[in-house]
A protein has these predicted regions:
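Short beta-strand segments
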Residues: 6, 66-70, 108, 132-138, ...
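Active-site nucleophile and cofactor-binding loops and adjacent substrate-binding regions
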Residues: 83-89, 106-112, 132-135, 292-298
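Structural signature of FAD isoalloxazine-binding scaffolds in flavoprotein oxidoreductases
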Residues: 156-160
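Gly/Ser/Thr-rich active-site cleft segment
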Residues: 64-91
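Adenylate-forming
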Residues: 114-120, 141-143, 162-163
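Short, flexible active-site-adjacent loop segments at beta-strand->alpha-helix junctions, enriched
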Residues: 71-73, 85, 111, 155, ...
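Short hydrophobic alpha-helix segments
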Residues: 27-29, 83, 153
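ATP-binding/phosphotransfer module of carbohydrate and carboxylate kinases, centering on a glycine-rich
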Residues: 1-64, 73-76, 94-105, 117-127, ...
Length: 311
């Protein structure tokens, strides 16, 4: 057996897996971020101990624990900073292993780990080389080459949400710079584009009925119904993302792009909007990359964490 753990800013998702990759049980605990997140690892250990007791499984039968975290992780398991958890710099693999009776621990960045999950058991399982793009509140990414996470020199590989895509942008991204991909293709980015269209044009669109409360889902739903304004927003978003993918493709030449995160619930409609622009802008040798939806949903991080141990 092994544990796959996905630590988010509000909840920790835990999964007990067979080493063959079957999810046997999954559950959640609250992420206690107070006091610089000092309780998070002990809460995880308690949750794992309780599950072993409940299932009658000995710790000797556990191959290890994989853990995905919201921040850059170096190749030796050092967390550089997890702002969402209140953590500074320390070696999370050593610390968790020490707390959980010396068990093997592997840690990775959450977006990279989710990509590994999709590559192992999800939308990318037919491929060795994939790029996963997660469109949520922000935009995350993960690059899998020959079945392994490409982390780069100090864990920064795959941070595609912060690719610079627009010189004319005046709003700042969360990272402090202007013109990042995340500002145009995340759920918040789609809403921003919609509000900009409503505020700066007289275009007739049902988006106006939602006013300030419009969501990315509303935009995609209206676009599917043929609303011209919503379609313009989706087309703009697809142009930014498809073009960014063509830039990524000439560097890593993946067999497939896997699109996940909340925005991907728009389904094939979203894929079509991206794919056309990707094909139009990418170098010919990279043009046949498949573009698929992720299939593991919120469980991708758990699967990927388990894959770091079992795969």
């Amino acid at each position: 057996y092994c544990f796959g753990i996905d630590v988010g800013g509000t909840t920790v998702k835990l999964g007990l897996f067979s080493t063959a990759g079957e999810l046997l049980d999954k559950w959640e605990i609250t992420t206690r971020t107070e006091n610089f997140g000092e309780n998070i690892l002990s809460d995880i250990c308690e949750a794992m101990e309780a599950k072993l007791a409940e299932k009658g499984i000995s710790l000797d039968d556990i191959e290890g624990v994989g853990i995905g975290l919201p921040g850059p992780i170096t190749n030796d398991g050092t967390v550089l900073q997890c702002v969402n958890l209140g953590w500074g710099t320390f070696n999370v693999e050593e610390k968790l292993s020490e707390m959980f009776r010396g068990i093997k621990v592997k840690a990775g960045n959450d977006a990279n780990v989710a990509a590994l999950g999709e590559a192992w058991q999800g939308g990318g399982k037919d491929y060795d080389d994939i790029v996963m793009i997660t469109l949520g509140t922000g935009v995350g990414g993960g690059v899998i080459i020959n079945g392994k996470i490409l982390t780069g020199y100090n864990g920064g590989a795959g941070e595609i949400g912060h690719m610079h895509v627009d010189d004319n942008e005046t709003d700042s991204c969360n990272c402090g710079r202007k013109g990042c991909l995340e500002q145009f293709t995340s759920a918040t980015g789609v809403v921003r584009l919609a509000k900009r269209l409503m505020n700066n044009t007289d275009k007739e669109t049902k988006m106006r009925e939602f006013g300030e409360n419009i969501t990315a889902k509303d935009v995609f739903d209206l676009a599917k119904e043929g609303d011209a304004g919503a379609n313009e927003v989706v087309e703009t978003m697809g142009t930014y993302l498809g073009t960014a993918m063509s830039h990524i493709a000439v560097v890593v030449n993946p067999q497939a792009f896997i699109i996940g995160g909340g925005v991907s619930k728009a389904g094939q409609f979203l894929i079509d909007a991206i794919k056309d622009k990707y094909r139009e802008t990418c170098f010919a040798a990279c043009g046949d990359a498949a573009v698929h939806l992720a299939t593991l949903g919120n469980d991708a991080g758990m699967y990927g964490a388990a894959a770091m141990i079992c795969k």
